[in-house]
Amino acid sequence: MSSTENLETQHVERMRHTLSHVMAAALTEMYPGIEFGVGPAIKDGFYYDVDLSKVKGSDGEAVKISDADLPKIEKKMRGIIARGFEMQYSEKDRDTTLAWAKENGQEYKVELIEELPEGEVISFYQLGDFTDLCKGPHVGSAKEIGAFKLMRVAGAYWRGDEKKAMLTRIYGVAFETEEELKTYLNRLEEARARDHRKLGKELD
C-alpha cells in the first residue's frame, strides 16, 4: 500500500468513526434518555450499541428501534451534518469523567470508566451538543463526511457477554464518495440475488 493509499484508508476509518458519533447525536435528539455502549468504526462502516429501556413511548412502554426507523434516523444525521460541526477535543480526569457519566445517566460508560486506573486522563470529543468519551481519531468537521447509509438493526449483548444486557446495535456503511457507496450497495444486492437463486434451486 502506498503512503497516499494509507492516508486515504486512515481518513475513511476516521470518517466512519465520526459517523458513529453523528448517529449518536441524532439518536440523543430523537430519543431523550437513551444510553450508549460503544460505537466503533468497522470494515466498510460503523455501528453504535444503544439501550432504549429508559426511553418510553406514548403507551408507557420502552421504545424499540427497527429497520423501519433507519430512514428517519439517517435524515436526522444528514440534518446535523448540514448544520455543520467541528469535532472538539478535550481531556478530563477520571473522577470528573465518572461524575459526567453518572449525571447523564450513562451506566455503560460508568462501567467502562470505573475499570480505568486512578489518575487516568480520558479524552472526549464534542459534536454540537453531543459529547462522548472516546480515544478517537476523528475527522475535523462535517465537511469531511462522505457518503453513508444506515443498513440494519440487530441485537448485541453488552461486551459480548450473554449474561449482560441485550443492546440494540445500529449498523451503517460509509465511503468517501457516492459512487463507492453505490458500488458497494449494488454488490450486496447482487450477492442477495445469487443467494436467492441458489436457495430457489435447492428448494426445487
Describe the role of every protein-language-model region.
Residues 12-30, 41:
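Active/ligand-binding-proximal structured segments within catalytic/core domains
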Residues 43-45:
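Catalytic palm active-site di-aspartate
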